[in-house]
Swiss-Prot record:
Native species: Listeria innocua serovar 6a (strain ATCC BAA-680 / CLIP 11262)
EC category: hydrolase
Protein name according to UniProt: Aminopeptidase C
Record keyword Ribosomal protein present: no
Reaction equations catalysed: Inactivates bleomycin B2 (a cytotoxic glycometallopeptide) by hydrolysis of a carboxyamide bond of beta-aminoalanine, but also shows general aminopeptidase activity. The specificity varies somewhat with source, but amino acid arylamides of Met, Leu and Ala are preferred
Gene3D superfamilies named among the record's database cross-references: Cysteine proteinases
Gene: pepC
Amino acid sequence: MSTEITFDQLESFSKKWRENPDKLVFQASIMKNGIKAATENPVSKATVQPVFSHEVHTDKVSNQQQSGRCWMFAALNTFRHKLNGTLGLKDFELSQNYTNFWDKLEKANYFLENIIETANEDEDSRLVSWLLDTPQQDGGQWDMLVSIIEKYGVVSKSAMPETFQSSKSADLNHLLNERLRTDAVILRKAVKEQKDTAGLKEEMLAEVYQLLVMTLGEPPKVFDFEYRNKDNEFKQDLQITPKEFYKRYVDMDLKDYIPLINAPTKDKPFNQAFTVDYLGNIVNGTPIKYLNVEMDVLKKATADQIKDGETVWFGCDVGQLSERTTGIMDTDIFLLNQAFGFKTAMTKAERLDYKHSMLTHAMVLTGVNIVNNEVNRWKVENSWGEKIGNNGYFVASDAWMDEFTFQVVVHKKYLSKELIEAFSNEPIALKPWDPMGSLAL
């Protein structure tokens, strides 16, 4: 039987609060400065320093601005680190707007195909409701970027620079999602009336293409790659296609890279491959697929790749115990237990099961600090510009990584034969709303 809060209980709560006058100091500070500023731990700031025993040289950070393209920025940053080192470039970037254009067009097609497939289900079914909740968005995962690269290649940022709507995507997303939901109404009716949907869908995609061209620009079919390297030598490669550019200058075989996740919930055994139903961007593209491993395995592969001079794409819950001004991510960064007198004690698995944590953001791991063969902190390249953190770079304690990192992408050479074989097996399909299907923004 449900019970309401009584006035006797309220009096008891108030009395208990008044019995601890030491809390008044914290109360005054919190009410004036906010929870994070009032409880920031100076010991954490002093120990989580931006100094690392192993570090990959990288240039200034990029800036996704007011968009949710972190997963895209992070992946393209791993590519540009390799490219900049090979060609001797400084602060060169690949076009995030180019991949963004194709991602949105392909997500529109992916959504419309799913609407056609589910047209005979009720509008309020959980699956249809999930599809309609967000027809498309900025967010994504590693395998979505792989699909884009394999189909469309990449271009330099100068060949397709940022626009107002690529950097501030809210209005574009609102308009595009309104268009797609309208199209969903039409397609569902057409299926029920046994009308042709292929022609309708093509007309709809033509309208989406027009919308994207008007807001993001039209992607180049060929472009001129001209630059000066760090020795001031002029180089040029004229009329190169985006796929030729990727093959010639980046040339990473993305099929050799394996997404590892750490999801310690009862329904996800370790050393098992997983996928997520209805998650993707390109129809018949690279399927979403991960290998669930223990955290020690994930971190060792990550550290080994960094020690060999290659950065690592990773996905985490960036908002948890993170101080963005200083760029510190640490389980002890805030004195919350001391301030409020109670402790939140959920495990990583419980936070996933009870919707308190999931992958929300993708960044790049560029350094690791190892003392007496033990890792104690990691260097993180964010994509929020240079005004936060240490010129845009963050530092994550190893304890924070354990609790709030959910995915990394590493070369298969850093994994055992048994793990590579496990990844090659048929994956278990997770429901679309599983926390491992969340998108990095």
